[in-house]
Amino acid sequence: MGQKINPIGLRIGVIKDWQSNWYADKNYTELVHEDIKIREYIENKLFNADVSAIQIDRAANRIKVTLHTAKPGMVIGKGGSGVEKLRSDIENLTGKKVHINVMEVKTPELDAHLAAKSIAIALERRVAFRRAMKQAVGRAMRQGAKGIKVMCSGRLGGAEMSRTEWYTEGNVPLQTLRADIDYGMVEANTAYGQIGVKCWINKGEVLPEVDENEETKEENKEKSEEKSE
């Protein structure tokens, strides 16, 4: 299943967290649709700001939106005018109080969504697909990725028959739950039709935190067993 399922969804509750954090007993479907509208609005409005993730938290009638972006200056705007305009637009869209946080993505080369987006933009500019894939893989590996896998699917190079091409470097263990695998999927709109771009980036293993009290208990247990022997 690790080869087919979304690797972020597979790791939720293990090393990944939900991108929408809230609970609703009633009006659940309305809130889900509201989340979708917020995400679509932000993605369309801030397309050039390289937004990699949108996290939504709710409490009562307040919404907290956290934007992870490689270009925070473009989101915030001059004197905060950009983020203020965005906040008022989302408030008009939802009819609720909105607070916006902007988080900078320090290494966009290691963000799977932004890597896939860079390949998609290159394909739309008629760059050869192998060259676009190879450049994205090289950038990620230079920034310290343990492994990266890229897939392009569609009428590559304007061919009459669609096909799928892969480019892999390093190690990408999809079934290892402690492996921090980032995943992104973007569609490129070319003159020959849509090309799907998928990207998996392995950032290394995330080991569970060991509780110091539990660690000392284990040590004491081992010492007592040694004495009894």
Swiss-Prot record:
GO terms for biological process: translation. Residues 208-229 are annotated as: Disordered. Residues 38-106 form the KH type-2 domain. The keyword RNA-binding applies. One of its GO terms (molecular function) is rRNA binding. Keywords: Ribonucleoprotein, Ribosomal protein, RNA-binding, rRNA-binding. One of its GO terms (cellular component) is cytosolic small ribosomal subunit. The keyword Ribonucleoprotein applies. Residues 208-217 have a biased composition (Acidic residues). Part of the 30S ribosomal subunit. Forms a tight complex with proteins S10 and S14. Belongs to the universal ribosomal protein uS3 family. HAMAP family: Ribosomal_uS3_B. Binds the lower part of the 30S subunit head. Binds mRNA in the 70S ribosome, positioning it for translation. This is Small ribosomal subunit protein uS3.
